[in-house]
């Protein structure tokens, strides 16, 4: 496992009530690189994300919605970019359902969110999925101090792949491209898997009916699977490796929300 330094992220949200139970929101996020690596004069952006979401409250216990997000990652330079930093772009489509239940000042909720991430960069589709689907499941608890404009919350979230590449199928294709006989070797890390586990704790403060802020700490444990094909000459893959790339990171988040 690889430990990453603390990250800093800023969130903003504007929400408009269109009709009874129907809301439209616009969201933005800016995430910085590890604070431990801060150096003056260096671009510390990690990603920028903007999007919009439409939600509808069916009843007191159930809300559904969907939206679109655009995400841009700032990557370190490589030889093909002249060692200049460059952007990678993603288009993300989400749908979600949230079930919630209140007990006194406590509120418990479960959110299920299928998510499709569309890549725009050049990739080898034997190594990576261009249109990557995953299922996010979040369990959250909140406590509202009724006499004060203050709320604390905690949640845990799990990400499951829905269409990850099966390394064994890739392996078969590699042997076919090499005109070799498949010796029956199988990769132990195949099929769908949990690729991220997330937990957070924080608080929110309401200035008035329209304005609020939140501050939170988040822990991420990423469970990656890297498929790599070594090319000895054009279109002839000779070596095939599958490795796990596990890493965890800490994040401090600050958010602002406005509703009207």
Give residue spans per PLM region.
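Outer-envelope beta-barrel architecture signal
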Residues: 18-26, 60-62, 91, 104-112, ...
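Membrane-embedded beta-strands of outer-membrane beta-barrel proteins
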Residues: 10-12, 50-52, 95-97, 137-139, ...
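Outer-membrane beta-barrel "beta-signal"
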Residues: 97, 246-260
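Start-of-domain marker
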Residues: 1-67
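Surface-exposed acidic loop/strand-edge motifs in secreted or periplasmic proteins
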Residues: 35, 43, 72-92, 112-121, ...
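Outer-membrane beta-barrel transmembrane domain signature
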Residues: 107, 111-234, 258-260
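Hydrophobic/aromatic-rich structural module bridging two neighboring secondary-structure elements via a short loop
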Residues: 39-103
């Amino acid at each position: 496992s690889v430990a990453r330094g603390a990250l800093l992220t800023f969130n903003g949200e504007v929400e408009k009530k269109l009709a009874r139970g129907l809301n439209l929101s616009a969201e933005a996020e800016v995430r910085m690189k590890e604070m431990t690596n801060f150096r003056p004069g260096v671009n510390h952006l990690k990603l920028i994300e903007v999007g919009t979401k439409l939600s509808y409250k069916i009843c007191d216990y159930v809300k559904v919605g969907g939206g679109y997000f655009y995400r841009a990652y700032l990557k370190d330079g490589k030889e093909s970019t002249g060692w200049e930093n460059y952007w990678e772009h993603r288009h993300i489509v989400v749908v979600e359902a949230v079930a919630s239940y209140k007990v006194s000042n406590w509120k418990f909720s479960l959110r299920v969110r299928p998510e499709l991430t569309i890549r725009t960069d050049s990739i080898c589709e034997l190594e990576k999925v261009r249109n990557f689907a995953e299922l996010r499941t979040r369990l959250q608890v909140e406590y509202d101090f009724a006499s004060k404009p203050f709320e604390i919350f905690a949640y845990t979230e799990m990400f499951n792949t829905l269409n990850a590449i099966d390394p064994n199928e890739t392996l078969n294709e590699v042997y076919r491209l090499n005109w070799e006989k498949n010796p029956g070797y199988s990769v132990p890390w195949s099929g769908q898997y949990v690729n991220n586990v997330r937990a957070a704790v924080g608080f929110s403060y309401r200035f008035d009916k329209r304005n609020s802020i939140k501050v939170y700490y988040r822990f991420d444990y990423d469970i990656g699977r890297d498929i790599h094909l070594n090319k000895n000459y054009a279109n002839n893959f000779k070596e095939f490796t599958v490795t796990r790339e596990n890493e965890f990171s800490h994040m401090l988040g600050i958010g602002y929300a406005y509703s009207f």
